[in-house]
Amino acid sequence: NVDPAATSRIDLAQLLNGGPPKDGIPSIDAPEFDTAATTPFQKEDIVIGVVLNGEAKAYPYNVMNWHEIVNDTVGGVNVTVTYCPLCDTIVAFERGNTTFGVSGKLYQSCLVMFDRNDDSLYAQPWAMGVIGLQVNQTLTRLPAVKTTWAAWVAQYPDSQILSTRTGYDRDYQRYPYGPYETNEQIIFPVRHQDQLTQHPKAIVSYVWQADDATPFNQFSGDS
């Protein structure tokens, strides 16, 4: 039993219940895969692409929207591939001998994952432990790209793609968040939203060099 208040790097008041309980959004822990010839997904569908040691795999948003986390092995490396539908962030990292699940909590409207070895909580966009025994520990990130299935399979024609045979009864052709993908609504509060001049869901890219000041009005607040 770990006291969250004693092992937290975040304000616990900002750790919110997302609705479903712990594991209420089930991770995929024994993923099955299709090929370009057998997948039901279309060329224009968005995927997360990962390639390690010559093995390429794609994880469709259609499936990730419902599960958010896939515990897999790619190129002989135990990996976890994650996606947060609320903030459109993708993060892949080495998982070692553990697996990760969906905690049911959100921080800054983003996925909070838990390590099944010791229940430590990790903020997905930063791949960092925020509560528990692994607080302040960072996960080893792996390259992952957001692209279309067409673009990915053109570059990696032998790539496998995550199957809809997940063991769960889900309609993987349906987006589960209604109009959220296209409207301006942010369901859960985030810091400094009143500073934004862009669309609330604008995708912002930035480069932050060590010892350089953070560009004014581009990024602010603690991590």
Show which residues each predicted segment covers:
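Mid-to-C-terminal functional-domain signal that highlights helix-capping/loop sites
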Residues: N1-S223
